[in-house]
């Protein structure tokens, strides 16, 4: 775990415990394997692991795919907090409704081609889609 800067096992466990609690990861204990967690808790465990390195940029590819609504909202809240704290959040999703809920700026990519950079000031689905079919 030295790759995360930990040489003190006690400090590491404390940090992991704090991240798991903050993300409301439902598990039997810190030694539980990620594969044994529900899909939503697995996603949150991945975020917890990323948080351990204190990144300045979060690259999220479909981070809420196949998770329940509560987990989805928790992930959105976490990423909003990180963005508000000055971190960059790149959020890739094919769910336009979700993008409109969470994004400040939207880069449209259609069939691998960059189409439009939009500032999300109450954009509608219809407005965004109009740029896709120009």
Per-region residue spans from a language model:
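Glycine-rich phosphate-binding loops of nucleotide-dependent enzymes
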Residues: 1-134
């Amino acid at each position: 775990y030295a790759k995360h800067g930990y040489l003190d096992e006690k400090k590491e466990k404390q940090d992991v415990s704090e991240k798991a609690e903050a993300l409301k990861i439902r598990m039997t204990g810190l030694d539980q394997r990620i594969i044994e967690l529900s899909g939503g808790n697995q996603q949150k465990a991945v975020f917890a692991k990323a948080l351990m390195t204190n990144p300045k940029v979060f690259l999220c590819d479909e981070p809420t795919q196949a998770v329940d609504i509560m987990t989805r909202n928790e992930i959105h809240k976490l990423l909003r907090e990180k963005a508000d704290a000055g971190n960059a959040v790149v959020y890739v999703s094919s769910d336009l409704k979700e993008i409109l809920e969470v994004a400040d700026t939207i880069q449209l990519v259609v069939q691998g081609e960059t189409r439009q950079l939009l500032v999300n000031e109450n954009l509608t689905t219809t407005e965004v889609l109009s740029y896709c079919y120009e």
